[in-house]
Every structure is written in structure tokens, then in C-alpha cells.
């Protein structure tokens, strides 16, 4: 009970203390850059936190219920440069709220329902360049106390309640102002007096955005003799007549860039006619843009005759029913046609045009030749265009072209190697369908080309000279293509200045060891999304400048032959993530290298084992492989291997002896067919036939002999016949010894088998017949035979009649030994 009371006595004061502590004193802000940038977004702060370093330069306090900013609210942050107070429910800003922020350049007050703004609210902001006061309930610029902000360059007061366009007198102090955004306010009328300050203090660099204001009237002369850098009027007019009248009210304006039209999701005009733009002839315009008009314009050329002297002309999301030739009458240097609809590709003949952007348009899918002698920049991407013979000077009518983008189009047939376009520096074909790329050296004349992208162009590289001539190329992107037999050959021979190479998604499985030998300046190489099963280091040893190598999303299990340490010393980033690493003892050295090179590898923690199954999904860095076996297991394994080896050797050496043993077991004491199996040399066959066979088989009693030339079964191995037909079916064995016998391997083999047969069979007997005198030196070569003849009796063949009589009598007696007697044989 006492301990419980003590615990309660401790917890109650602690809880009371915590309830009094403000969240800002213990909720941590996110430290983006130590001591520099802090994000304190949505932390429910009611006041400026005091636990942020004095050195902070960027502070985000958005979405906190601060509600009230008193004087010197940010005294603790004298180094502050960017302050975001978006949607902090601020209603009151007192004098000197930002005092001491002399280095602040950007202040964002978006979405605060300000009701009380003191005259000195922005005092002390001597370096402020950007002020964003969007959605702050601002009703008039007249009462906005910013006249002293002489360094201000950008003022954004969009989405407020401003009804009058009158620019206050203090604008004459804002001599550095470059951008004024008044879009989405309530301005309906513009009078001459509203712009009086711009007559007194011209701001020729000012960009003015009046979009999404419901303008009904612009007093003629209001903009007369006023110079602006940019004027934007989009989705301002409810009908065509108002638009026509207001554009006429702009008469006398000198503007560098004029933007007219609507927004994609803010359409006010129900109809459109080219007459609405006739008032443009009374303006001096350097660059003109017309955006988002869904209505088909018929014959727009005469519409823009008054813009013939402009330097830039742009149409975005405009439907054009019919267009006559863009002829030499126009002095445009830049023509932009984006996301428009054409019935056919326009005919372009513009002598002064240097830049043409014709992208994401619909209709007119077949490219037609143009005549643009001064053209340097050409973007024809995302149009679905088809080219029957690309590319040469005759296609574009220029020899000055430096930039050509034909990406995201249809079929482009390569019919020329860019004759007349030798000045090209940038060439992009990505995601177009290129034909005839590997039939000749397409880029041979492009010695000045720096950038080439042929990614995903259905190209199959079958010609090693495909990149010949690209001596200045620095960037080559060819992802998503293929190579013959999925093998990368030596195709980069001329690319000695290449620094970036992308070979991802090319289905590569192998590469030539010398594929990169000439790329001494290569810094970035992307080999990801291919089908490599091992990391071959050798091809990269010749890349002294290589810094980044990406081998992610392959099927790499281990390194190939070479040690991974042989990568160039310049390599700083190696990406091997999402591969099929084999975490087994076989690849232990490679896995250890991965752990040792953790600082070199990109996202090494994402490298996971694919095999074996029990380690699948485990991080390679943390996997632990035990590759040491138990000593007992090793000993037993070695002993087993030795035993098996010895048995195998013995079986091999005594195979036929074992066959004989198996036969003895199988046939047992079965009846013999032959009285004797004769072993002799083929060179003694005459004696065997004329003497031995004749006297024994035709004599009394007759004996049945087994002779190989007569009794062996055809189609059966000789050794099998010797064992099965000779030994197993005979009572005795007659060995005819001669010099030829001793020198014959087969005879010696049969004799050795006969010895085994005699040992295994108790009834067996070997009868030796010495056919002729054998030299002892020759006989001693067969040790066992020599010993047997020395210790046992044998028969000798003699030429005398008496000797032969005795020979046959002794031989018959030996053969009759063990034979059952049959009286019918006499």
C-alpha cells in the first residue's frame, strides 16, 4: 500500500507538468540539413518553436495553428532566408513581426485568413525578393504595406478578393519587380488611371499575369506606350465580343511575350472567330502564344499576318482545319505547334526560322519535306509521324541543323546517312520504329554529334560498324534494343569520347572481352535489366574513368573467374541490387567481397539471396554461411571414397575372373558338353586341325573338343565365348605351348583365366602340350607358366612314330581321367 501511494505521488506531479508543456517544446522538427533546413509541418505548434538552431536558413512551419504573429516573432533566427507559413490560420500580423530577418529572401503566407495587417508588418525585410500572399483575403493592393520592399522581384497575390487593377503609387519604389501575379481575382475593368504609375516609373522587365479574372472592359489607351516583358490573359473573357473589345483595348502596348487563350479545365468561350484577334495588329509583340482553343480555325495564316515581324510564334492545343503555306513573309525565328490538330502536315517555308517545335500533334501522320534554310533546332517528337527515307538535307531544307528530335514517332526508314546534316550535335530517335539501321553505317558523317538516343527503337544490332564515324559522341542511349545471339560485339571502336552509355533492357547474356577497350573516357555505364548470370570483371578493367556501373535487375549469382577487386579504381558506385545471388559455400569468396565493398555498392542492404531456398530473401550482408564440415564426416567420406576406388580398380583388373566365378556358381556341377577346351595360338592352328582334332575326335574312344573357330557363338564377345563356351562347358583344358603362344596376349589371357578356372572347379585340370622347344629366356617372361612347367608334368610333341604313339596314349589317358565310361563308344 505504501509503495502504491509513493508511485501515485510521483506520477501525478509528472502528469501535471506534462499537461502544461506546449507541444512545440518536445515535438521534434525534421532536420533536413543539419543546422540549416528544418521542416516543422503539421506539428500542432501554437507558437514559434524555440528548440531550433540560430543558424537555421530554411524553416517550414506550414499547417500549424500559429494564428497570431507578434513583434520580433523570429528574433531567434537572424540567418533565416526562406520562411514558409502556409495555412497557419494567421489572422493578425503585428508591426515588426519579421524584424531582424534581414537575410530573408522568400516569405510564403499562402492560405492564411489575414484580418489585421499592421502598416509595419513587413518591416525589417531588407532582402526580401519573393512574397507569396495567395488566398489571404487581400481586397486591395492599395492597403498592402509593401512599398518599402525595394528588393522585391516577385509578388504573388493570386486567388484573392482584389477588384481594382489600380497599381498603387508605391509601385514606383519597387524598381526590381519582375513578376506580378494577379490571377484568379475579381478584376473586371481596367482603366487608364490604373496604370498611371507605369508611365511614371516604367518596369520593362515586369511579367503581369491577369488570368482567370472576369475582365469585361479595357479602356482604350490604358496600355498605350507601356512596356512589359510578359502579359498573360487566359480564361478572362465570357464571350467573343468581350474578347475582341478587350484586345483592341491593349492598343499601343509593347510587350515581349503575349499569352492569350484559355486553360484546359477553365473554358469560358462557347465559340471563337479569328476576328477576335484583329486587335493584335495594334500591339508590338516579340513573342506570341495562343493556348487551348477547341474550335477549328480556318486558314490561320492571314489571321497572323500582323504578327509577321514577331520573333516567336506558338500555338498550344489549337485545332486548325486548314493551313496554307507558312511562307517567307513571316520573320519568325521560333515556331511552336504543340498538341494541335492538323488535317495534314503543314508546308513550311520560312527563311529566318531557327527553332521549330512540332510535338504531340494529331493528324497529318506522313512527314513532308520543309524548306527552312536557317533551322538549327527541330523537335518533331510525339506526333506518330512516318518517314520513308531519313535523313538528309533535302528532308529539312537546311545544312545548319544542330538539334533533331524524332522520338515517339511511327516507322522511320533509314535511307541516308545524314548527308548535308554534318552539323548535328543532338539526335533523338527513342521509342520510334527504326528500319534498316544495321544495313550500313547510318551515322558515318555525324562527326560533330554529341548526344544520340536510339532507345526502344526495335533495333537489332547485326552490323559492327553501326556507330562508325561518331568521333565526338559523349552520350549514347540504346536501351530496349537487341543484339544477335544476345552477344555484345566490338561496336564502340570510334567512340573514344563517350562518357555515358546505356545498354539496359537489351537481353544481353554475354559481351566481348574487348567491347569497351576504346572507351577511356566512359564515366557512367548502365547494364541493368539484362540476362547476365555472372559478373564478368575483365571487360571493365580498361575503363580508367568509370565512376558508375549499374548491373541491377539481372540474374547474377556470382562473379566470373576474376576477382571483383579488379574493377577500375575510379569506380565510385556499383549497383548489384535485385539479382539472383547464390548464398552457398561455392560462392563464399564473392559474398565476402560484397560485405567488404559495402561502401562501393549502391543500396547494398537491398541485395538478397535467391538460393538456396532456406536463405531466399535474406540480405546478403547479414547471411552467415557455415562451410566447415565435421572432421568425422570428412574422415568417413575420405575412407568411403578410398574403398570405392580400390574396389573399382580390383573389379576392373579382375573383371573376367569374376565373370568366371559367376559362371561357376550359376552352372555348378552341370553336365559338360566338351571333354577339353583347347587354348592355342592361331599360328599353330594347322597342327591342331590335322593332328589334335583328327586323332582325338576320330579315335577310339572319341573325344569332343571345344575349338574357337568352330564352336564359339557368332556375335558374342570373345571373352564371353572363352568363359561361357570354353571353360564352363569343358572338363579339361588343353594348353598348346609354343613360341607363338607365349608371344600372344590372347593366349596368355586365356591361360590366366584357365588358372582361375582350375582353382574354382575341383574337377578341372590343365593339360600342357609343348609343341616345340621353347627358349628358356622367352619362357621366363611368363613367370607363372614357367613355374608350372617346371613343377608339373607335361606332354611334348615328337616327330618320331614311337614318340607320337606314346604322346597320344598319354593324352587319351589324361582326358579319360574323371570321365564316365560308355561301352558303346568302343
From Swiss-Prot:
User: Which stretches face the Cytoplasmic side?
Assistant: 653-826
Q: Where in the cell is the protein located?
A: Cell membrane; Early endosome; Cell projection, Ruffle
The LRR repeats are at: 55-76, 79-100, 103-124, 127-148, 151-172, 176-197, 205-225, 227-247, 374-394, 400-422, 423-444, 448-456, 472-495, 497-518, 521-542, 545-566
A GO cellular component annotation in the UniProt record? plasma membrane
Is NAD one of the keywords?
A: yes
Glycosylation positions in this chain: 35, 173, 205, 282, 309, 497, 526, 575, 624, 630
Segments forming domain LRRCT: 579-629
User: Which residues face the membrane's Extracellular side?
Assistant: 24-631
Keyword annotations for this protein, in alphabetical order, are:
Cell membrane, Cell projection, Disulfide bond, Endosome, Glycoprotein, Immunity, Inflammatory response, Innate immunity, Leucine-rich repeat, Membrane, NAD, Receptor, Repeat, Signal, Transmembrane, Transmembrane helix, Ubl conjugation
Comment, domains: The TIR domain mediates interaction with NOX4.
Task: State what protein this is by name.
Answer: Toll-like receptor 4
Q: Which source organism does the UniProt entry give?
A: Papio anubis (Olive baboon)
- Gene (UniProt): TLR4
Amino acid at each position: 500500500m505504501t509503495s502504491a501511494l509513493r508511485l501515485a505521488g510521483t506520477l501525478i506531479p509528472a502528469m501535471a507538468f506534462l499537461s502544461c508543456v506546449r507541444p512545440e517544446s518536445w515535438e521534434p522538427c525534421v532536420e533536413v540539413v543539419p543546422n540549416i533546413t528544418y521542416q516543422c509541418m503539421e506539428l500542432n505548434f501554437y507558437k514559434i518553436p524555440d528548440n531550433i538552431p540560430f543558424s537555421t536558413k530554411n524553416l517550414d512551419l506550414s499547417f500549424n495553428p500559429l494564428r497570431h504573429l507578434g513583434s520580433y516573432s523570429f528574433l531567434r533566427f537572424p540567418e533565416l532566408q526562406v520562411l514558409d507559413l502556409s495555412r497557419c490560420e494567421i489572422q493578425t500580423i503585428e508591426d515588426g513581426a519579421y524584424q531582424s530577418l534581414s537575410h530573408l529572401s522568400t516569405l510564403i503566407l499562402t492560405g492564411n485568413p489575414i484580418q489585421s495587417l499592421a502598416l509595419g508588418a513587413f518591416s525589417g525585410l531588407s532582402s526580401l525578393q519573393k512574397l507569396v500572399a495567395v488566398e489571404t483575403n487581400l481586397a486591395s493592393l492599395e492597403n498592402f504595406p509593401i512599398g518599402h520592399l525595394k528588393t522585391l522581384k516577385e509578388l504573388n497575390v493570386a486567388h484573392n478578393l482584389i477588384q481594382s487593377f489600380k497599381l498603387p503609387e508605391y509601385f514606383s519604389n519597387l524598381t526590381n519587380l519582375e513578376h506580378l501575379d494577379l490571377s484568379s481575382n475579381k478584376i473586371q475593368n481596367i482603366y487608364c488611371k490604373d496604370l498611371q504609375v507605369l508611365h511614371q516609373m516604367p518596369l520593362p522587365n515586369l511579367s503581369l499575369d491577369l488570368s482567370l479574372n472576369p475582365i469585361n472592359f479595357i479602356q482604350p489607351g490604358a496600355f498605350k506606350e507601356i512596356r512589359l516583358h510578359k502579359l498573360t490573359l487566359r480564361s478572362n473573357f465570357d464571350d467573343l465580343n468581350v474578347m475582341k473589345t478587350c484586345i483592341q483595348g491593349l492598343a499601343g502596348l509593347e510587350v515581349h511575350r503575349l499569352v492569350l487563350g484559355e486553360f484546359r479545365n477553365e473554358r469560358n468561350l462557347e465559340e471563337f472567330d479569328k476576328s477576335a484577334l484583329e486587335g493584335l495588329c495594334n500591339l508590338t509583340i516579340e513573342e506570341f502564344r495562343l493556348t487551348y482553343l477547341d474550335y477549328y480555325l480556318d486558314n490561320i495564316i492571314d489571321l497572323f499576318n500582323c504578327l509577321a515581324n514577331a520573333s516567336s510564334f506558338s500555338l498550344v492545343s489549337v485545332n486548325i482545319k486548314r493551313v496554307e503555306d507558312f511562307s517567307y513573309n513571316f520573320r519568325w525565328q521560333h515556331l511552336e505547334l504543340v498538341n494541335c490538330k492538323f488535317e495534314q502536315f503543314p508546308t513550311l517555308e520560312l527563311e529566318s526560322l531557327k527553332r521549330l517545335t512540332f510535338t504531340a500533334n494529331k493528324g497529318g501522320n506522313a512527314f513532308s519535306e520543309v524548306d527552312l534554310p536557317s533551322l538549327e533546332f527541330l523537335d518533331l517528337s510525339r506526333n506518330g509521324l512516318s518517314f520513308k527515307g531519313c535523313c538528309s538535307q533535302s528532308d529539312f531544307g537546311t545544312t545548319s541543323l544542330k538539334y533533331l528530335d524524332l522520338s515517339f514517332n511511327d516507322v522511320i526508314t533509314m535511307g541516308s546517312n545524314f548527308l548535308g546534316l554534318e552539323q548535328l550535335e543532338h539526335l533523338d530517335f527513342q521509342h520510334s520504329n527504326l528500319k534498316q539501321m544495321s544495313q550500313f553505317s547510318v551515322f558515318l558523317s555525324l562527326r560533330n554529334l554529341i548526344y544520340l538516343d536510339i532507345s526502344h527503337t526495335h533495333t537489332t544490332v547485326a552490323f559492327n560498324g553501326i556507330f562508325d564515324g561518331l568521333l565526338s559522341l559523349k552520350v549514347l542511349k540504346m536501351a530496349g534494343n537487341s543484339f544477335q545471339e544476345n552477344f555484345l560485339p566490338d561496336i564502340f571502336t570510334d567512340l573514344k569520347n563517350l562518357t555515358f552509355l546505356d545498354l539496359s533492357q537489351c537481353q544481353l547474356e554475354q559481351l566481348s572481352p574487348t567491347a569497351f577497350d576504346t572507351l577511356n573516357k566512359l564515366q557512367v555505364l548502365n547494364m541493368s535489366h539484362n540476362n547476365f548470370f555472372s559478373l564478368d570483371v575483365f571487360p571493365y578493367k580498361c575503363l580508367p574513368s568509370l565512376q558508375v556501373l549499374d548491373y541491377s535487375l539481372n540474374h547474377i549469382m556470382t562473379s566470373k573467374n576474376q576477382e571483383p577487386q579488379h574493377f577500375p579504381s575510379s569506380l565510385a558506385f556499383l549497383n548489384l541490387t535485385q539479382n539472383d545471388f547464390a548464398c552457398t559455400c561455392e560462392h563464399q569468396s564473392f559474398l565476402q567481397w560484397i560485405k567488404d565493398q559495402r561502401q562501393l555498392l549502391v543500396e547494398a542492404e537491398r541485395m538478397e539471396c535467391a538460393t538456396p531456398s532456406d536463405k531466399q530473401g535474406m540480405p546478403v550482408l547479414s547471411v552467415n554461411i557455415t562451410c566447415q564440415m565435421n572432421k568425422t564426416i570428412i574422415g568417413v567420406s575420405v575412407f568411403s571414397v578410398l574403398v570405392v576406388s580400390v574396389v573399382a580398380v580390383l573389379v576392373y583388373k579382375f573383371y573376367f575372373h569374376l565373370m568366371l566365378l559367376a559362371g561357376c556358381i550359376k552352372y555348378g556341377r552341370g553336365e559338360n558338353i566338351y571333354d577339353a577346351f583347347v587354348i592355342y595360338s592361331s599360328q599353330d592352328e594347322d597342327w591342331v586341325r590335322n593332328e589334335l582334332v583328327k586323332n582325338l575326335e576320330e579315335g577310339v574312344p572319341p573325344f569332343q573338343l571345344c575349338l574357337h573357330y568352330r564352336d564359339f557363338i557368332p556375335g558374342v564377345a570373345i571373352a564371353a565365348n572363352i568363359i561361357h563356351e570354353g571353360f564352363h562347358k569343358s572338363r579339361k583344358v588343353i594348353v598348346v605351348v609354343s613360341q607363338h603362344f607365349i608371344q600372344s596376349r590372347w593366349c596368355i589371357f586365356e591361360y590366366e583365366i584357365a588358372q582361375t578356372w582350375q582353382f574354382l572347379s575341383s574337377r578341372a585340370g590343365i593339360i600342357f602340350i609343348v609343341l616345340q622347344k621353347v627358349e628358356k629366356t622367352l619362357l621366363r617372361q611368363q613367370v607363372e607358366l614357367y613355374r608350372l612347367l617346371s613343377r608339373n608334368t607335361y606332354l611334348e610333341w615328337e616327330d618320331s612314330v614311337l614318340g607320337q604313339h606314346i604322346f597320344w596314349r598319354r593324352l587319351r589317358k589324361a582326358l579319360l581321367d574323371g570321365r564316365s565310361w560308355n561301352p558303346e563308344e568302343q
